[in-house]
Regions:
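TM-lumen/periplasm interface segments of multi-pass membrane proteins
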Residues: 1-29, 33, 38-41
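Transmembrane catalytic cores of multi-pass membrane glycosyltransferases
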Residues: 1-4, 136-168
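Aromatic- and kink-enriched transmembrane "portal" helix at the membrane-lumen/periplasm boundary
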Residues: 17, 53-73, 85
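Hydrophobic core segments of transmembrane alpha-helices in multi-pass, intramembrane catalytic enzymes
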Residues: 28, 71-83, 101, 119-123, ...
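Transmembrane-helix signature of polytopic, membrane-embedded enzymes
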Residues: 35, 39-60, 76-77
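Membrane-interface transmembrane helices that cradle and orient dolichyl/undecaprenyl
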Residues: 81-97
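Membrane-interface alpha helices of multi-pass inner-membrane proteins
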Residues: 98-112
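Perimembrane helix-loop-helix junctions
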Residues: 119-144
Length: 168
């Protein structure tokens, strides 16, 4: 049977704790800079400030206290990437690439951190909020289902049941 990405990250953290801390630190820096860039680019504050970077750092210190810090930082990086791509898809023309990537990251979230499964509700809300066409909705649903279907296919190719990773 094939392990989920969250299980693989937990195994990596257990086997290589020093490398896991380094990777978690890099993920924390990447996510903090991404969140800071989002706030400046889309003018979420009245003046051009990078206040979101230290705010994310303070929140990330709380994430690092738990035992599965690598999966928590990977999930927060995926959420930041999904938010960035949802913001990019808000345009006058078609945003197939951005909405596909955003839904792909949202689809990966429950595989990395199962506590993020309720965030799957974000996709229909984002599609309705951004008033996307039916073609873009189809692309978004395909991006959402692609990680789960890929994991099921790889598990089936390894000799397990096709729906075994979803049933767990």
């Amino acid at each position: 049977a094939v392990s989920s990405p969250g299980e693989l990250l937990a195994e990596f953290q257990e086997a290589h704790p020093v490398w896991a801390r380094w990777i978690a630190g890099l993920l924390m820096l990447f996510t903090g800079m991404s969140v800071g860039r989002l706030t400046v680019r889309y003018n979420l504050y009245s003046d051009g400030t990078c206040l979101a970077i230290p705010l994310y750092g303070a929140i990330a210190c709380g994430l690092a206290v738990g035992g599965d810090y690598l999966t928590a930082f990977a999930a927060s990086a995926l959420l930041a990437l999904a938010t960035k791509n949802f913001c990019r898809s808000y345009c006058n023309g078609f945003g197939f690439d951005a909405i596909f990537r955003a839904s792909l990251y949202i689809g990966l979230l429950p595989l990395v951190a199962t506590a993020a499964a309720p965030l799957l509700v974000l996709l229909p809300l984002a599609v309705m909020l951004f008033r996307r066409t039916l073609r873009e909705v189809t692309v978004a649903v395909a991006g959402l289902l692609l990680p789960v279907l890929t994991l099921c296919y790889v598990n089936w190719g390894a000799g397990g049941g096709f729906l075994a990773p979803v049933a767990e």
